[in-house]
Amino acid sequence: MNEKTILVAVTDIFFYTKVRDALMAKGYKIERARTQQDIAEKASSTTLSAFIVDMNDEKLNAFQALETLKADTSMKTIPILAFANHEEVDTFHRAKALGVTKIVSRNEFSSRLKDLVEEVAGTHV
């Protein structure tokens, strides 16, 4: 089996565990990023099928992470699935402007995680 790796930038351990368990059940390998440095190092050293980022994570600067990924030619094609609080319209617009493949509300992310990852990761060869 060709294992697909997904980098997950979520510092909340309970939310991360939910994401990890759901995706590992689908056969994905999960790498966790807890810091900006983690994101840059893991994204550049691993062939990623997708990058998942919590735009509201207070311990990570999600916008900086997106800028870092998109600035590097070897990483700028990685599909990105982002999620944020639904009322933060500016966050949605800014994330899209920075090249996020898909951004959804936290509720939609939680309820449709597997489908969303398949949709986003399926765009990456």
What are these regions (language model features)?
Residues 53-69:
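Conserved phosphotransfer microenvironments
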Residues 70-76:
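Conserved phosphotransfer cores of two-component systems
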Residues 3-13:
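Conserved acidic segment of CheY-like receiver
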Residues 13-31:
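Two-component/phosphorelay signaling modules centered on CheY-like receiver
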Residues 87-102:
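Alpha4 helix (beta4-alpha4-beta5 surface) of REC/receiver domains from two-component response regulators
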Residues 108-116:
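C-terminal output helix
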